Amino acid sequence: MNNRYPVMKKGLIVLVVIAVAAGGYYWWKHPAQPSSDGDLSGQSAHGKRGNGAHKPLAPVQAASAVTESVPQYLNGLGTVTAANTVTVRSRVDGNLMSIHFTEGQQVKAGQLLAEIDPRPYQVALMQAQGQLARDQATLANARRDLARYQKLAKTSLVSQQDLDTQNALVSETLGTIKADEGSVASAQLNLTYSRITSPIDGRVGLKQVDIGNYITSGDTNGLVVITQTHPVDVVFSVAENNISQIMQAQKSGEPLLVEAWDRSNQHLITRGKLLSLDNQIDATTGTIKIKARFDNQDDLLFPNQFVNARLKVNTLQDAVVIPAAALQMGNEGHFVWVINNEDKVSKKSVTAGLQDSQKVVISAGLNAGDRVVTDGLDRLTEGAKVEVVAAQSRATKETRASLPSKGESE
């Protein structure tokens, strides 16, 4: 008997240790919950509401497909060039006496720009005029002698040889006078050239020579450069495949519209008209150069400025148009999410035509009036019901949709 008690005591201790370990493990896996009846009932009700609640509908923005007249453009990167550019040079040599323009000023054709010292050319003109007057007097005297010789020849007092010699002298003097008249005209022209005038209407650039310098007609830099910017041209290139479209559009007889957009292609600068096409294709790039002319009275275009040119070659009538944001690309091509009368969405394949950053023409797959999703596309599934919201309220709707519903575990 005495030996049984120690064995039973050891077994009892082992059982107690196992029970304590099991209880600790259970307590660790299942923390204590509020034991009040009110709390238990509240928790139960809260859980029921959470399990039965519906998630909010996905907020989206939508737009209806519409029919519009859509212009078709050919795009190209262009450079603004002056309609005419002239380097004003002196035609005679001399000291620059005065300048009559301000850098950057608009000038008219014939307007005085600068003056060269005219005195050497005034002297040359006087010399030429004096020589002409002397030879004219010689001619008058030769003609009088010829008249006398002709009278005397009738009475045989003058030989025929003397008469012929006098005739030759008159003719020679006439030739000398012609040369003198040319010298006078040349001197007058040189004197005129001492006043440098603008050959065209345009804007003057920076002066290349200061007053007091001796300038020559062979100076390559010239006095100033004038660019004609009213009108102004834009030269750009399009692919050779587009030549037939341009030629076809020109058959209408109406000048083709050309738009000049800024470097970012976001803002329209001005509109002009097609002026001409080059007569050959650039074999290196496979493009052809096009020149458009712009009135530019507001000076929005400046020589050597880069612009994006758009040449209008056609207009699509009654085209189905949707916002560009609605068009998506998948493995099977372009598609849109269409919203039906029950506000449920479905994916629909479409054929896209002309498009820009704002709109896209749908050639097939949509009808005018169909509603398409333009924003909130990332969380759509086939047949899902959505809530169409205005642009300003979509952010609020998305915030609410991302929060857990009442009753959902956090």
UniProtKB/Swiss-Prot annotation:
Membrane topology of this protein: Peripheral membrane protein
Signal peptide per UniProt: 1-21
Main location: membrane
UniProt-annotated stretches for the region Disordered: 36-56
Cellular component terms per the entry's GO annotation: efflux pump complex; plasma membrane
Localisation per UniProt entry: Cell inner membrane
Domain of life: Bacteria
An example Gene Ontology molecular-function term: efflux transmembrane transporter activity
Protein keywords: Cell inner membrane, Cell membrane, Membrane, Signal, Transport
Pfam families: HlyD_D23 (PF16576)
Subunit and partners: Part of a tripartite efflux system composed of MdtA, MdtB and MdtC.
Family as reported in the entry's similarity comment: Belongs to the membrane fusion protein (MFP) (TC 8.A.1) family.
Matching PANTHER family: MULTIDRUG RESISTANCE PROTEIN MDTA
Name of the protein this chain belongs to: Multidrug resistance protein MdtA
Organism of derivation: Pantoea ananatis (strain AJ13355)
